[in-house]
């Protein structure tokens, strides 16, 4: 018998009977006996699905031989050969089943059939057979098919020769000579390709000889043959390094002449595997770039770009000259393709080409302004801005021009993109102090166009921290004064509203004159009206008037007093700085007086009903604190120590904190770059390959990265599995019912990426045969039962095994439940055994992920489902709870460790992020503190996701943490 690994594997792509109806072998036998060809086709499909689900049904073989095999229906014959592929051909003792003799006669008859498609289909079936006893009788017919007139037959005949030799060499001892003679005489390119595949694996010398004979005309060969030549060269070059130089030269020639996209892709990848020389890599990658630009399929573009990214990661610095060529891919409309191309170009960018990259991206940025598809253009614009920011931060010579470029677009951007530009300006000013004055001036000039309050708050912070000289402070102050508008704000707005109302009354002609007079209240008194009680004032303000207001005035009247609090801090910073750089008391006093007027005006309008939302307590406290500081400054008895303390709090602390944050980010970036570079550093004890000794040491063979990727794609993580995997399976065995039940059941649960597999074992614990025993499963949540177990009979104390696959479509909490059903004795009603519920662990589908602050906030605002969980835990520290939360939810911490505080801190707040295997995003915000009375950890965890299920599932995991950590203490008995 052949080994298990050599057996073919099958995947059920589509179930033609989704009604979940189950049929017994008797039902199938009756359908085959009496049905027409069309009914037999449906029956055969059901039989194939049932067999692929794990029920071999060997008792059907004779019925299929009798009632299906004689049919002339082409579709039925095609299904019949599918059945021959999967039917058990050996008996329990390992010998060939007697019925297969009849099958062999039918197969031999089809191998001599006058219809070439039946012959070809039969030969293709033979390539999947692994039983030497069956194949032995087919050899003469297969050899006869090698000379058939139709190429469709010959292409499968040569593959059948190859596969028969692989199963058993003694069946075709001269297979190498047969294939070699066939390929020399053959004219059809597909037949040649199939023959060369077999020759390359069985007879390397003859394959190399055939390649040498066709080298001169390789550019004129069929692309199919060129592709297998490239595959042979890539594999043989690793085995025989002496020929590598000649192979590379041949591949370079083929790459420059071929027009087939498939051959270009394979040849370019083969060159990158065989050589790390930039003279070889650059032309190869250039061809890949041309391919990515030319093809229309976005999936192919992404595959090609992924390969280019891998090549650059393995050969750092070799592809720098292709930076601008990569950006040609930006002509694609797909945002993912553009993002991938920009990422690669940033990896390739250097100080030599940074200016050209920025110029090209600037042109792309300008094209987004007039794009009719505004949503897509806005996303692409944000992507371009993010890339340009990266260039400017990395290369100082581009920073100044990039800042002015981005500031030109800041008025057209949404809040996220605009605030991103301001954050970038903060970083540039801190990193490159020589650009401070120029950047500050440009920023102040463009702030009138800013529509985002968040971006404007960042700009206010920059003005307060980096305005140094007297002229700079006055320039910033002038902008603030103009941005506030006419003060006092309350009186000027009331005046404007009154004028608008009078103008409206003059132009309106009321059809029915209504008496006007004072309003009399129910208690008989006259009503009075104050500016603080105006409710309808906002109705008199049009959208045009609201948009025409200067920025700070617009934010204040719309109820954004957080910006007003930032403005108050900025004003204090500017006043303190101006006192240090100027001795002009008149100007200083004028600044303080104007500052007091602005801040008091903001407080008064914030307490009125003119604003859309009244001022909150926190903002009011911060503004009033600033007013108190300004009033204290007027006091001549103020001590120098108090002034010094004030300057430290406002001028030194925040700036030094931001500087430290930049340094930490720089260190982390350096660590990541060092970690990435270490992947390509070879250890000092790596063996050196000498061509002269290649024949002596055959074990020193270079790894083929393409073959490794292929194995990883086919086997997944199984290629890394160790012998301990069988032991770890014991942990996944779950009892489905108890030992006292008439049928004992247990399941080994295996979680794959998109499904859960239950290997179920049933044990008949009675002394009777259980007839028509079957298991019914059902699910709760986003789970779907793919396989339906068939009915079976289980002898006394007998065993029955079957496999059930459950499709998982999301990371929601899922439950699998069911029962065992079997017939009662002597015609009694069916009996049931209720099974325990199986809970699908969602943690197997959730992995930690990373995201920048900008992306996190965007998702947080977009996601509509929120689950807020109260936290009360007896863990000793806040950091201990955070560790338990990360362990229990598989989420990654986004907040830098420096911002989390010490282990004994009394307050902790951080953001967490994870992605599921299905592409779902899960966001979390943790806000906890130490209760001063009970010393417990208290607070909240807020979880957001696009769907409700994931938020609830993670909420259950958070609640489970509290149950595990809160232990009841036994105080007395």
UniProtKB/Swiss-Prot annotation:
Membrane topology, record value: Peripheral membrane protein
GO molecular function: structural molecule activity
PTM info: The N-terminus is blocked.
Record carries keyword Protein transport: yes
Alphabetized InterPro entries for the sequence: ARM-like (IPR011989), ARM-type_fold (IPR016024), Armadillo (IPR000225), Clathrin/coatomer_adapt-like_N (IPR002553), Coatomer_bsu_C (IPR011710), COPB1 (IPR016460), COPB1_appendage_platform_dom (IPR029446)
Name of a matching Pfam family: Coatomer_b_Cpla
Record GO cellular component, one term: Golgi membrane
Phosphoserine modified-residue sites: 181, 540
Keyword line: Cytoplasm, Cytoplasmic vesicle, ER-Golgi transport, Golgi apparatus, Membrane, Phosphoprotein, Protein transport, Repeat, Transport
Phenotype of null mutants: Causes a block in ER to Golgi transport. Exhibits exaggerated ER structures displaying interconnected networks of ER cisternae. Cells arrest at all stages of the vegetative cycle.
Keyword Phosphoprotein attributed: yes
Localization annotation: Cytoplasm; Golgi apparatus membrane; Cytoplasmic vesicle, COPI-coated vesicle membrane
Residue spans of the HEAT repeats: 98-133, 134-170, 279-317, 318-354
GO biological process: endoplasmic reticulum to Golgi vesicle-mediated transport; intra-Golgi vesicle-mediated transport; intracellular mRNA localization; intracellular protein transport; retrograde vesicle-mediated transport, Golgi to endoplasmic reticulum
The protein's assembly and partners: Oligomeric complex that consists of at least the alpha, beta, beta', gamma, delta, epsilon and zeta subunits. The complex interacts with ARF1 and PAB1.
Function: The coatomer is a cytosolic protein complex that binds to dilysine motifs and reversibly associates with Golgi non-clathrin-coated vesicles, which further mediate biosynthetic protein transport from the ER, via the Golgi up to the trans Golgi network. Coatomer complex is required for budding from Golgi membranes, and is essential for the retrograde Golgi-to-ER transport of dilysine-tagged proteins. Required for mitochondrial morphology.
Additional record remark: Present with 26000 molecules/cell in log phase SD medium.
Protein name according to UniProt: Coatomer subunit beta
Organism of origin: Saccharomyces cerevisiae (strain ATCC 204508 / S288c) (Baker's yeast)
Lineage, uppermost ranks: Eukaryota, Fungi, Dikarya, Ascomycota, Saccharomycotina
